[in-house]
C-alpha cells in the first residue's frame, strides 16, 4: 500500500551566506517521503530565496496536491508543478524505483565566495584536474578581474568557472576582461551569464574570447540548447529547473552539440546534494559538478556528505507536517 509523509526542516547556515541582497541565516525546505509498502524513498523540495519563482508556502501546497495525486494512482505531469516540487518528487520516485545509481561524483569544484586564500588552500589539496568556481559581480569588476588574473597566474594548471549572475552592464563586463591577461583567458572554462541579457553576453564573449555558459537563460520559457558562438556549457540547477527527466533532456541536448552540462547546487541540504552527486556521476561522468556548498551549512540532513564532519539532523527527529 502506498503511503507518504512530508517533513519541513530548518538548518542553520554559516553567517557569510549572501544571496543577491539577502543574508541567508537558515535554509528552509521540505522532504517528501514515499513508500510503496516495501521500499521507502525521499526527495527534497527547497525553493531558493531570491532565485526560485515559488515560495516555500507555494511549494508546500503544490507538493501536497501532487502527493495526493500519486497516492490516488493518477497520471502525473511533474513539470506542471513548480520546479522545486518537480525536482524533489521526481528524485523520490527515481529512488523508489531504484533507478538512481548509488555511485556519486563528490569531486566538487571548490567555490570561492570570500577570502581568496581559502581557495588556494583547497586547490593545493586537490588531486587531478584543478577546477574552481569564483563568484564575480559582487564587487567592482576591476577587482574581480585582478583576482581572476592572480589565480590563473599563480596556479598554472588551474581552470576557472566564473559566475556573474547577470550582474554586469556591458561596460562593466568589458572592464573585468581588461584586467584578465589574454593569454590566461582560455583557462576560464566559462563565465556564467556575464551581462543582463543573453545578447550582451554573446557580444562580450565575441569581443573578449572568454567562453560563456547559460544558467538563468536555461530557465527562461521556451529555452532550447543550440550552438552559439562562445557558448560552451549550460549549468543545470535542478531545484530551479524542474524534474530529473527535464534535466536529463537538457543534458542530452547539450552533449549532442558537444557542449558541457554542469549539474549545480541551489544550496540544498546534504540529502539532495548527495542525490545530485549521484545524478552527476550517472549523466555527466566527464564533468566535475558544481556542488561545493555543504560548507555553507552548520548542519547536514539525513544523509551525510562524504568526509564532512558537520552534525547530521535526522528526519526521524522532525515532525511530519502532512501524512497519508
From Swiss-Prot:
Annotated active site: 135, 237
Keyword Flavoprotein: no
GO molecular function annotation: magnesium ion binding; O-succinylbenzoate synthase activity
Enzyme's top EC category: lyase
Disulphide bridges: none
Entry keyword set: Lyase, Magnesium, Menaquinone biosynthesis, Metal-binding
A GO biological process held by the record: menaquinone biosynthetic process
Catalytic activity: (1R,6R)-6-hydroxy-2-succinyl-cyclohexa-2,4-diene-1-carboxylate = 2-succinylbenzoate + H2O
EC number(s) given by UniProt: 4.2.1.113
Cofactor: a divalent metal cation
SMART domains (alphabetical): MR_MLE
Residues engaged in binding Mg(2+): 163, 192, 215
Domain of life per record: Bacteria
UniProt entry tagged with the keyword Transferase: no
InterPro entries in UniProt: Enolase-like_C_sf, Enolase-like_N, Enolase_C-like, Mandelate_racemase_C, OSB_synthase_MenC1, OSBS_N
Pfam families registered for this protein in UniProt: MenC_N, MR_MLE_C
Pathway: Quinol/quinone metabolism; 1,4-dihydroxy-2-naphthoate biosynthesis; 1,4-dihydroxy-2-naphthoate from chorismate: step 4/7; Quinol/quinone metabolism; menaquinone biosynthesis
HAMAP family: MenC_1 (MF_00470)
Family: Belongs to the mandelate racemase/muconate lactonizing enzyme family. MenC type 1 subfamily.
Function as written in the Swiss-Prot or TrEMBL entry: Converts 2-succinyl-6-hydroxy-2,4-cyclohexadiene-1-carboxylate (SHCHC) to 2-succinylbenzoate (OSB).
Protein name, per record: o-succinylbenzoate synthase
Organism expressing this protein natively: Aliivibrio fischeri (strain ATCC 700601 / ES114) (Vibrio fischeri)
